[in-house]
Structure formats: structure tokens, C-alpha cells
Amino acid sequence: MPKTINVRVTTMDAELEFAIQPNTTGKQLFDQVVKTIGLREIWFFGLQYQDTKGFFTWLKLNKKVTAQDVRKESPLLFKFRAKFYPEDVSEELIQDITQRLFFLQVKEDILNDDIYCPPETAVLLASYAVQSKYGDFNKEVHKSGYLAGDRLLPQRVLEQHKLNKDQWEERIQVWHEEHRGMLREDAVLEYLKIAQDLEMYGVNYFSIKNKKGSELWLGVDALGLNIYEQNDRLTPKIGFPWSEIRNISFNDKKFVIKPIDKKAPDFVFYAPRLRINKRILALCMGNHELYMRRRKPDTIEVQQMKAQAREEKHQKQMERALLENEKKKREMAEKEKEKIEREKEELMERLKQIEEQTKKAQQELEEQTRRALELEQERKRAQSEAEKLAKERQEAEEAKEALLQASQDQKKTQEQLALEMAELTARISQLEMARQKKESEAVEWQQKAQMVQEDLEKTRAELKTAMSTPHVAEPAENEQDEQDENGAEASAELRADAMAKDRSEEERTTEAEKNERVQKHLKALTSELANARDESKKTANDMIHAENMRLGRDKYKTLRQIRQGNTKQRIDEFESM
């Protein structure tokens, strides 16, 4: 039995290991990968490897894996990557896994600066990436530093602004909070809808020369071929849609494109190496095939996939709505519980206050009772003294009469009797005054006692009212092929039909232009980052982008502009570059 070969395939978020036979073809390995990860939109993807010369190459599906220039390592290493890009992610990418694989690959290209992304867009994209990873922002869970382990912005953007890690996190967090209620899958799609408007998104660049020998860039993408000047890969100067091309071929380093317009000359350029022309041919054929397919009715398979995706999305939305409803109910129950606890605490505090007031009133009552007793004792003492004084007065009266009688009996001298009479009269007068004073004091004590008695009655009534307040009960708790590398020439006929005239891509607008919310966010971020920007660290791409913005250009306006005039005019323009 032939010895098996170990293979390791790295997708954007997983590592897969397989054991293949020496006669296993590229297609068999590819099919095994897509089956393992559950991917059905296979036409966008391919398997990439590093050949023995160090170049990254796409695995040919119609040849044996071992017959290709794969480095003889163990295991054999491959990357599962998007080879072709959709025109419109929201219309073409059906499965969640397809969207996620594109999201992860595009995000990596942006972070590595393989796709130029302006700072304000980079921050907004970062917030969608965070929403897709963490879901809704929750201050109880997402504490300060929760993004410390995430790579979210291109190094260029970090170096161009005088902001530390915490300040970047604060800005991304603000926009993360803005996405509350957005499904993670929707955040992935929103990221891609904005990213697909970036000028370098989905473009494969190749260094070429025209007949004059001018060094230029050829950009191959989902919409056609574009020509760029050597120092500007953001702004194409000439464009040829796939619908204008009928044949592509190369002979060694010379590449020839034959337009559908018979009056137009051939479009000829030169690549530095034969292998580059092979790769250009393969990309042209694949992108042209997908361009034509999009302009035809969906196949039964695609219709079924879309129907299934709609059903799955509807199911997720229902589940989400159910979860949100349960969450709201739980939050309401928590709030109600907190309210009851708060009311309970307030009532307990009120009860405590009433108890303190009752205790204080009781103490005052006891004090008033004690004082009333003291006053009663004082009154009795004053009354007793008054009675004593009255008795003494009576005795004095009797003594006076006795003296008078004695004077008669003893016949004392008039002077002595007068003296004694004067003394007795003075004594009687003093006693009378003392008696009146004591009676007055007794009356005063009687009035004070009466007032105390009234206060006592009033306090007893208040106490009775306080004690009668009812007790408050406690509340209840609640996925063509590159040509054979041995051939120095190859040709491909790019079939066209009535659908070829459909150039609807020229009518497209950017997500920021369509979506007021995105437009508003980008405007706010531009303003917010302006003060922290270090102008001395601007790159050539930054300056090109700024100039394009100043002139009101975007990816689709530029596309319309570079396709103006007939094919011959544009080819002549290319030759004169």
C-alpha cells in the first residue's frame, strides 16, 4: 500500500491536517478542505503554497499535488485563501462561513497595509471587528483593557497619531457601543461593505511595461483590468471592463488582450517573468467567468443556498428577538426587585425613625410625669405652710385678745401696753403678708401643675397615635487554474453573450454615500483624529487619498471616469503613458 503524505492546510481561523495518497489531485484535496469546514461557495477560494523558488503559487486542481512544485516538507503546507473577490459582498456572499473567511482575510490585509485604509475608516472597521468578536458592549464584562490583546489597527495608523493604547481603546469602545443590538454576523457584513469600497480591496497588482517601456501597474479585479502609474496604486488611470475583452494570451513575457471592438488594436504589455503572465491569465479567466455568471440568473444550487441562508438568518433573528425579550424581562424583574428592596429599606428606615420618635416621646412623658409629681409636692408644701401661717395668725389674734384682757385685768401702764400692742400689730402684719405670699405661690404652683397635666395629656394622645400606626409588612422577593508552467505561451477565449452589456457596477456608490449612519461616523472620526495626527508621518498613500478626497473622488466615480471613451481611445492612452 502506497505511503500516505501528511498535509497541513491553514484557513484564516483554523489549522487542518490530512493524510493524502501520492496520486491525490489538487481538486480532491480542495474538496476535502471545503467539506471539512462546511463551505459551499467554493468558487472564490483556492489553495496557496510556497514553491521551491520561494514564490506563492495557487495549487492546480487538475494535477496531482505531488506533481506540482510544492516544497517537499512534512507536512506539506498550504493556505486556504480567497483567490477571487465578489463585486458586492452583501449580494454575493451567502453563507456566514464565506463572509467570515473574507472578513478575516480582508482584515489581515488591512492590518498588514496590503490594502490601504485611511485612519478614520480603520477605527470604524475596528469597532465592527470588536462587535463581531465580543457582541454588545457590556461595561460589567468589558472592563478597561479588554481590547489590549487584540490587533485592531494598522501599525501606520498607530504611528501617525499621538495616542496611547488606552486612548485608542477609548475611541474604539465608543463606536463599539454604537453597534448595540447588532448580530455578530451582521457586524462582519458591515465591515466588508465598508472595506470593499477601499481602492486596493480585491485587486491583484502586477508590475508591467507598455511598448514604450514605461513601468506601470496592472490591476486585476472582479470588474476588469485597470492600469496604474508606478507611484500610485490607489487611483487607476485607464480601465477595461471584462465585457470589452474577448481573448487573452501570452507568449513568454508578452501579454496580449484582444478587445471585442474589432476596430480597436490589441492591448499589449510585458511582464518581467513568464510565471507572472501565467498567473495573470489564470486570474483573468477566473474573474471573467465570475463576472459573466453574476449577470445571469442564479443557478438552482445558488438559489437553494440563498433560500437556506434567508431561513437561517430569519431563525437567528427570531432567536435573537426571543433572547432580547427574555433579557428585557429579566432586566425589568431585576429593576422591580431593586425597587422593592429600595422601598423596603425606606420603610425600615421610616419604622426606625418612628420607633426613635416613640422612644423620645416616652422619655419626655416620663420626664413630664416626674416634673408634675415634683410640682404637686411643692404645691402641697406651700399649702401646708400657708395653713401653718394661718394657724399662727389665729394664735396671734388670740394672744392679742388675751393681752387686751390682761391689760384690763392687770392694769398695766398705757405705754407698756401700747408697745406690746404695736409689736403684736407689726407681727400680725408680717404674718398676713407671708400668708398672702404663700397663698400666691400655691396658686402659681397649681397653675404650673395644671399646664404640666395638659402637656401630659397631649403627649399621651401623640404616643397613642404613633403606637396605633399599622406595622408595614416586608415586601415579597421576586472557493482556473493556472496554465501548465512548462508552456511558454497560452491563450483563453473569454466568451461573451447578451449579458456582457450589463455594466451595472458603474452605477454603484460607496457605503458611506448610501448609508448616512456610516457617513456620520466617518465624519466624526475624521474630526476626532485630526487633533492627534502627526502630519510629518504622512505616507505617499495618505497624500494621494487626501487629494482624491479633496477632488471628490471615490472608487466608483474613478471607475466611471477611467472607462470613458471607446476601447481604442483607452488603449492609445495606455500606449502613451
Curated annotation (Swiss-Prot):
Residues 375-409, 466-518 are annotated as: Disordered. The modification N6-succinyllysine is found at residue 83. A motif ([IL]-x-C-x-x-[DE] motif) lies at residues 115-120. A head-to-tail association, of the N-terminal and C-terminal halves results in a closed conformation (inactive form) which is incapable of actin or membrane-binding. One of its GO terms (cellular component) is pseudopodium. It holds the Pfam family FERM_M. It is found in: Cell membrane; Cytoplasm, Cytoskeleton; Apical cell membrane; Cell projection, Microvillus membrane. The modification Phosphoserine is found at residues 74, 407, 527. Keywords: Acetylation, Cell membrane, Cell projection, Cytoplasm, Cytoskeleton, Membrane, Phosphoprotein, S-nitrosylation. It comes from the Eukaryota. Phosphorylation on Thr-558 is crucial for the formation of microvilli-like structures. Phosphorylation by ROCK2 suppresses the head-to-tail association of the N-terminal and C-terminal halves resulting in an opened conformation which is capable of actin and membrane-binding. Phosphorylation on Thr-558 by STK10 negatively regulates lymphocyte migration and polarization. S-nitrosylation of Cys-117 is induced by interferon-gamma and oxidatively-modified low-densitity lipoprotein (LDL(ox)) implicating the iNOS-S100A8/9 transnitrosylase complex. The modification N6-acetyllysine is found at residues 79, 139, 165. GO terms for molecular function: actin binding; cell adhesion molecule binding; double-stranded RNA binding; protein kinase binding; signaling receptor binding. Residues 375-401, 492-518 have a biased composition (Basic and acidic residues). The modification S-nitrosocysteine is found at residue 117. It is a peripheral membrane protein. The modification Phosphothreonine is found at residue 558. GO terms for biological process: cellular response to testosterone stimulus; establishment of endothelial barrier; establishment of epithelial cell apical/basal polarity; gland morphogenesis; immunological synapse formation; membrane to membrane docking; positive regulation of early endosome to late endosome transport; positive regulation of gene expression. PANTHER family: MERLIN/MOESIN/EZRIN/RADIXIN. The [IL]-x-C-x-x-[DE] motif is a proposed target motif for cysteine S-nitrosylation mediated by the iNOS-S100A8/A9 transnitrosylase complex. In resting T-cells, part of a PAG1-NHERF1-MSN complex which is disrupted upon TCR activation. Interacts with NHERF1. Interacts with PPP1R16B. Interacts with PDZD8. Interacts with SELPLG and SYK; these interactions mediate the activation of SYK by SELPLG. Interacts with PDPN (via cytoplasmic domain); this interaction activates RHOA and promotes epithelial-mesenchymal transition. Interacts with SPN/CD43 cytoplasmic tail. Interacts with CD44. Interacts with ICAM2. Interacts with ICAM3 (via C-terminus). Interacts with PDZD8. Interacts with F-actin. Interacts with CD46. Interacts with PTPN6. Ezrin-radixin-moesin (ERM) family protein that connects the actin cytoskeleton to the plasma membrane and thereby regulates the structure and function of specific domains of the cell cortex. Tethers actin filaments by oscillating between a resting and an activated state providing transient interactions between moesin and the actin cytoskeleton. Once phosphorylated on its C-terminal threonine, moesin is activated leading to interaction with F-actin and cytoskeletal rearrangement. This is Moesin. The gene is MSN.
